[in-house]
Structure formats: C-alpha cells, structure tokens
A protein has these predicted regions:
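Extended alpha-helical assembly domains of large eukaryotic scaffold proteins
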Residues: 1-320
C-alpha cells in the first residue's frame, strides 16, 4: 500500500510541476530510484495529449532526457512530436494553420537532428513505433494531458508492435522534404491541402517550371533526387537563348553598334527563357550575354555532380 501511495504522490508531483511550468524544478529533483517512474509518467502524458497542449509534455520529456545525457531518447521524443504535428498538418482547415503546424513540425525535426548529431555516427538512431495510436487513427485527440495516476490499463493494438529504425539521415530527409513543401506553398498554395498528392520527387519539376533552378538544384542535392529533368530543361533553355541571340543579332546587323547593344540588351532582359538567370543569385555577377551565362550555369552544375556521364548523355540527346 505504501508503494502505491508513493507512486501516486510522485505522479501528482510530476504533473503538478509540469502544469505550473516548473520544469527546472522537476529536473533538479533528487529522486534517483524514481527516475524510471518519472520518465513513464512524462511519456504517458505526452502520448495522450494533443501536440499543441500546454504544457508540452514532449518538450518536457526532451528536456528530461537531455538533462540525463540520453540524447537518443530525447531525439525519439521530438521525432514523435513532429509526427503528431504532421497529423494536424494534414487536417488543417486553412493555409495559415497548415503553415503554422508545418513550421512547428520542422522545428521538432530540427531539435531531433540536433540531439542525434551529439551522438557518435554509429549510435545516431532510435526505434520508432509505427503503430502509434494517433498516427494510426489519423486524427488528433481533443483531450488535454491526463492528470493523476498513470497505472491504469491502456489497451494496446493486437499483434506485435511495428518498430522502425530511424537514422539521422532519415530525419534530415523528412526535415528537408517539409521545408521544400513549405517553400513551394508560396507559389502553389494547393499543396497546403491534405488531399493534394505530394511526393518529394515532384519538387524538382515544380521548381524548374517556376524558373527557380537554384532551388531545384539544392533540393535535388538534399533529397538525393535524380536530376535528369533539371539538366534536360536547362539545356533547352540554353539552346533557346542562343537561337534568340543569333536571331536578334541578324535583325540588328545594320544598326549602330551602340543602338544594337542597347536593343539586344533590352530584348534579352525581357526574354522569358532568361528568367531563371534573373532569379539566380549566382549568375548576377557573371558578365556576358544571356546564352553565355546560361551555358556557364549548365557547365558549373554539370561539373558539380557525381553523375556527369549520365547527365552529359541527356544533354547530348537534347542537342541532337
């Protein structure tokens, strides 16, 4: 009976300190033999509360693990929080709320990454339960964090638990995929709707269609996407710009050199195929005509990739 009473008191103490936003006091408590129960209490509260609840038990659990030097568990708690927020993101009623949830989700992924990088490379992983009740239902809970005892029976799904090993590279990929979607939402607001199909591989053609080749390149590198469409579209831009240059040069062949340079410069500036050069911070300081800068842009990126032979074949096929 005394053990049950002690357990109840410890549980009440933990929840009371959390509700009073006294996390520092909780972390300073010298309750060595009760640390496992404190961790179970915080984990239970985090699992059964809304990811937007205050106090945020996921953040408290993260601080608890960090204070004990357990960066693996700290990362796992924030990864779970990010996925809970992902459910809210899919069901967000408006673009503004979706962006707000997605920003919080990205922050949780980033905190998870920061915890994992503190570990040796061989230990930068954790196990994640794919049968998480909230993720399985696809609906956020309306309940606030539970108070009181946590020793009541909690039904578990039938069958063995489905565990996934999550590595640092996996979290980084999810983080960059989310940032990419947030960036694309500025141009394509329909991506904010949960019913809109979204795959990371779709980001590259969307950036290319928007003449944002810098973003397309960085996204392809971060997410390790094939760049076939990038080099194919870029080669076509180069060809069209060079053809337009020679056509303009022939048109103004008999004009005064000063006027010819002025006319051709104005038309190059207005050429829609040169829009990607105007958007790129890299090409802003490059001298030369638009087609010369475009070919240089292609060459620089071709030399920067590890699959130059494959992409040279794509460029050659476009030029034939």
């Amino acid at each position: 009976p005394f053990d049950d009473l002690r357990t109840t008191c410890i549980t009440s103490l933990v929840t009371t300190l959390c509700e009073a936003h006294e996390t520092r006091t909780l972390l300073r408590l010298d309750l060595l033999e009760w640390q496992p129960h404190i961790e179970r209490t915080l984990s239970f509260q985090a699992r059964h509360a809304s990811p937007l609840a205050h106090p945020s038990y996921f953040h408290i659990l993260y601080a608890y693990h960090v204070s004990r030097g357990d960066y693996k568990s700290a990362a796992a708690s924030m990864y779970q929080h990010a996925h809970r927020l992902g459910v809210l993101t899919r069901d967000a009623p408006s673009l503004e709320s979706m962006q707000a949830y997605a920003v919080q989700q990205a922050q949780s992924f980033l905190v998870c990454i920061n915890a994992l990088v503190l570990l040796p490379a061989t230990l930068a992983w954790f196990a994640h339960d794919n049968t998480d009740s909230l993720a399985a239902t696809g609906r956020p809970t309306d309940r606030h964090a539970l108070r009181g005892r946590v020793t009541h029976y909690v039904p578990q799904p039938a069958g063995p638990a489905s565990l996934a090993i999550v590595q640092l590279a996996d979290v980084r990929r999810e983080y960059h995929e989310l940032l990419t979607r947030l960036q694309l939402m500025q141009t394509y607001p329909e991506l904010a709707h949960g019913a809109t199909p979204w795959r990371a591989v779709d980001a590259l053609p969307l950036f290319v269609a928007n003449d944002d080749y810098d973003a397309a390149w960085s996204t392809a590198e971060q997410l390790q996407l094939p760049m076939d469409s990038f080099f194919d579209a870029l080669t076509l831009k180069c060809v069209l710009l060079e053809r337009a240059f020679h056509k303009r040069a022939a048109h103004y062949e008999h004009e005064d050199e000063a006027l010819k340079s002025l006319y051709m410069g104005d038309e190059e500036e207005a050429d829609p195929n040169a829009a990607f050069l105007r958007r790129s911070a890299r090409t802003a300081s490059w001298p030369g005509h638009a087609h010369e800068r475009a070919w240089k842009y292609l060459r620089v990126h071709l030399e920067a990739t590890e699959h130059g032979v494959q992409y040279r074949r794509i460029i050659a096929e476009r030029l034939i």
